[in-house]
Structures are given as structure tokens and as C-alpha cells.
């Protein structure tokens, strides 16, 4: 099976692709041209075209089948949307292949897929749960170790987990490309693979590939605390710190109805301002709660102020969850409340205001949730970029998120500075240019 090496594709000079996608692809192809190179890491910010990069990465690299591993169902669906043979097919819409006959055969791995179907596929994608494990239906128990030549790990910060290690160990002969938008892990484990390309968030902000970002914190009330240790007494933050830690304070603030309502009111204010400035764009608030019960309370508080609310969490039945996503896509919601469900892979470009009602300890988790509002709204839909693609992150001043935000603030500041980029030269470009110059020289002699 030599589809990925024999099919003519339009990638390096393709004006429909984004510069970070092309630059990353060039680095991928050059890296794996050395047989000694087996494992690489590419960092591409959310909203920059990671799914598109995954779709072009195998060309000129893979000698046979490709396996794409995703961490969960939502991320898997994002990959599937890119690769479906429908009107949204990436290879056709972005002029990657020159004929619909050249589209690769793509299959989602399911327990009931036939062996014949697997063998005829060029690309197989699945969430990690269906690939690893002791179940007879797991992919590693159905195909030989050399079935794939190239494995692409989406959301690579999960790769150090045991289930991922098991899959990569089984297919150890394959080349491995890790792709992530957030190169941080909360458990201090290093993401595998040699970093061969990293596009800074500031660069894609400057190019307007993603929304700009800004932060606004609220602290409308003077904070007082109560505790059973000292009943009937209002305690200041300084009083509490004498016998409680900072984490206790941050959790208390996150779960406080009064503090939550401060964030709710500010997020609604910003939504109203946004809709007044750009009434045709269905902007929405993404609110992130601590738990399902907390999310239900947030929903009641938002609804009490006249907003339409959709809740998404992992305990919902599939049918209810599908209805919830449909309501979001059909703009039957002003507020989407999530409990660790939308953190990866869900792309809805109209999520423009992020209201955070919980503390974070992991920079990866914080980066994931901020990434959900990064996707830019297309130019043909907006009033102005600085209005519609200017994401707002809102949280309480005392919830402990300011240190997390500093990472993004540095990127925001860098994005405001104009940088003249150096040219990127490849060996292929050099050879082509050399031939061109020779022909020019030859023409001059004839004259």
C-alpha cells in the first residue's frame, strides 16, 4: 500500500492552507525522511488547523496505513468532520488532492468493522478506549504489530498515560507523530517525542487565525468567611489564612453564590455589549463549573436573569447530550455550561466569553478551557475582527487563576508587537530554484 507516497498532492504551495500548517508539514516530512527518526512532537495552538495538519501529515511520510488516536469521543468527532466524504471534506475543499478519486479511504474503528474493511483503509481513526485493553474487540487484539506505518496521536499531552503507552508499544515499528495545542501536563510527566515544530500562540493571534484574548476579573464585594470552627463570626481573608490554606479560600469563593453571581452578571454585561455591537453574530458564554450540581445551580442563576442555557457533562445520556449539542449548533442557547466535557475537541466558534467558576491547579486544564474560545469567527460573518474575535476570560479575582493567566498574557503582549519573520527554505525549494536560475541563465546566453 503506497497511497501516501504515490498520490500527487498540493501542500507546500497551497494558498488555502495556513502558514503554520505548511511549516509544520515541511518539518514532519523532513524529520521522518531519516529512518532513524521515529517519534516527533508538533505544537499547534487550538484553532490554527490541527485537524487539517493531521489530514496532510501522512503524505510523503507513511509507507502504508495510518492510525489516528484521539483521547475521547468529542475529539474523535472533530477529526471525523474534517475527513468525511461530504461537503466539508478537507482534502477536496482545500485542494489537497486533484481529484475526488484520490481521497484516501478513511474508517472509524468500531468493534464490528470487518477485517477486510480494515485492510482496505488508508486511515483508521479511533479514541484510545477502543484501541488498547484486554477486550477481544480492542484494535491491538485484531491486527498485527506492523499493520500501521504511521501513528498520529491527537492531543498528545495524554500520551504518557498507560493506555496510550500500551498502544504505542504494540505498534512499536510505526513512526509516531504527537500533535497538541497545549504542551502541558498536570502530572509533570514529559510529553513524548522530539519537538520539531512549535507555533507560538502570539504568532497565530497576530495573523488573526484565532481570537484575540483579554482577561477581566471581578471582586465586587468585600470578602468575609464563616467556619464551624468559629461560629457566628465573619472572618476576613487574613483571619482565615491563620488556620486555613489558600486552596480552601479559593474553593470557598468558587462555590459561593454571591461570588458566582458577580461573575454571572459581568459575563452577561459583556455578552450584551457584544451583541449590541454585532447583533448578527450568535455570540455565547461558555461557563465552566466545579461539578454537575454546581453547573445546575449556575444554570438556574443564568436562567433567572433571562438567558437560555444548555448544560453539557459526562453523566448525560448520549441522546440527551446529542440534543444539547444540537441546541448549541442551532443557537438555541446564550450560555453553555460545561463540567469537563467540552475541554477537548469541541469547536464552536461562537463561544466568545469564558466565565470560569472553578480554580485550576493544572496549566494544561486551564489552557484547554481557554482554548475553547480561541476559534475565530470567519470574516464574512463578522462586523469587525476587534469586536467579534476578541475573546474575554472572566473569573473572580480571588479564585487563584491570575498566575495561570500570566502565561496567556505574555502571548497576548507578544501578539501586539509586529515581528518580521525570516523566510523558511526547504531542500526541495532550493533544488527547484536552482533549476529555475539555470534556465534563466541559459535564456540570457541565447539572447
Name each model feature, range by range.
Residues 308-420:
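Conserved RecA-like P-loop NTPase helicase motor core
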Residues 290-313:
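Conserved helicase motor "Helicase C" RecA-like lobe of SF1/SF2 P-loop NTPases
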Residues 34-57:
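Walker A/P-loop
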Residues 253-255, 259-262, 266, 270, ...:
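Long, largely alpha-helical accessory region at the distal end of helicase-like NTP-driven motors
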Residues 128-131, 141-178, 182-183:
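SF2 helicase catalytic motif II
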Residues 89-135:
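Inter-Walker segment of RecA-like/P-loop motor cores
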Amino acid at each position: 500500500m503506497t497511497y501516501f507516497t504515490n498520490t500527487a498532492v498540493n501542500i507546500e504551495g497551497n494558498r488555502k492552507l495556513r502558514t503554520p500548517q505548511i511549516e509544520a508539514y515541511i518539518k514532519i516530512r523532513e524529520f521522518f525522511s531519516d529512518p532513524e527518526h521515529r517519534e516527533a512532537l508538533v505544537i499547534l495552538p487550538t484553532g490554527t488547523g490541527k485537524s487539517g495538519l493531521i489530514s496532510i501529515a501522512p503524505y510523503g511520510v507513511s509507507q502504508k496505513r495510518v492510525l489516528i488516536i484521539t483521547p475521547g469521543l468529542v475529539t474523535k468527532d472533530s477529526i471525523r468532520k474534517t475527513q468525511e466524504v461530504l461537503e466539508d471534506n478537507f482534502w477536496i475543499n482545500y485542494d489537497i488532492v486533484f481529484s475526488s478519486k484520490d481521497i484516501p479511504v478513511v474508517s472509524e474503528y468500531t468493534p464490528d468493522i470487518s477485517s477486510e474493511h480494515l485492510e482496505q483503509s488508508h486511515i483508521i481513526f479511533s479514541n484510545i478506549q477502543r484501541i488498547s485493553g484486554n477486550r477481544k474487540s480492542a484494535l491491538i487484539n485484531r491486527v498485527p504489530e506492523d499493520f500501521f506505518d504511521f501513528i498520529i496521536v491527537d492531543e498528545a499531552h495524554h500520551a504518557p498515560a498507560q493506555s496510550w503507552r500500551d498502544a504505542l508499544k504494540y505498534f512499536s515499528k510505526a513512526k509516531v507523530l504527537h500533535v497538541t495545542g497545549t504542551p502541558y501536563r498536570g502530572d509533570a510527566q514529559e510529553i513524548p517525542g522530539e519537538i520539531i515544530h512549535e507555533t507560538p500562540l502570539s504568532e497565530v493571534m497576530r495573523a488573526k487565525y484565532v481570537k484575540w484574548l483579554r482577561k477581566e476579573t471581578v471582586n465586587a464585594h468585600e470578602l468575609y468567611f464563616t467556619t464551624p470552627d468559629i461560629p457566628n463570626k465573619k472572618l476576613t481573608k487574613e483571619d482565615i489564612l491563620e488556620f486555613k490554606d489558600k486552596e480552601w479560600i479559593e474553593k470557598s469563593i468558587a462555590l459561593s453564590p454571591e461570588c458566582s453571581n458577580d461573575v454571572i452578571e459581568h459575563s452577561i454585561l459583556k455578552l450584551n455589549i457584544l451583541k449590541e455591537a454585532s447583533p448578527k453574530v450568535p455570540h455565547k458564554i461558555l461557563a465552566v463549573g466545579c461539578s454537575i450540581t454546581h453547573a445546575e445551580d449556575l444554570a438556574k442563576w443564568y436562567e433567572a436573569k433571562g438567558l437560555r442555557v444548555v448544560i453539557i457533562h459526562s453523566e448525560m445520556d448520549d441522546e440527551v447530550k446529542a440534543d444539547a449539542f444540537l441546541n448549541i449548533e442551532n443557537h438555541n442557547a446564550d450560555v453553555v455550561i460545561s463540567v469537563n466535557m467540552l475541554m477537548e475537541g469541541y469547536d464552536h466558534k461562537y463561544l466568545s466569553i469564558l466565565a470560569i467558576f472553578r480554580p485550576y491547579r493544572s496549566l494544561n486544564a486551564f489552557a484547554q478551557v481557554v482554548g475553547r474560545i480561541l476559534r475565530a469567527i470567519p470574516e464574512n460573518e463578522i462586523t469587525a475582527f476587534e469586536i467579534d474575535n476578541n475573546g474575554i476570560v472572566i473569573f473572580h479575582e480571588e479564585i487563584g487563576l491570575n498566575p495561570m493567566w500570566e502565561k496567556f498574557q505574555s502571548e497576548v503582549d507578544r501578539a501586539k508587537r509586529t515581528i518580521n519573520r525570516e523566510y523558511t527554505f526547504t531542500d526541495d525549494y532550493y533544488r527547484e530554484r536552482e533549476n529555475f536560475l539555470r534556465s534563466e541563465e541559459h535564456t540570457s546566453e541565447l539572447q
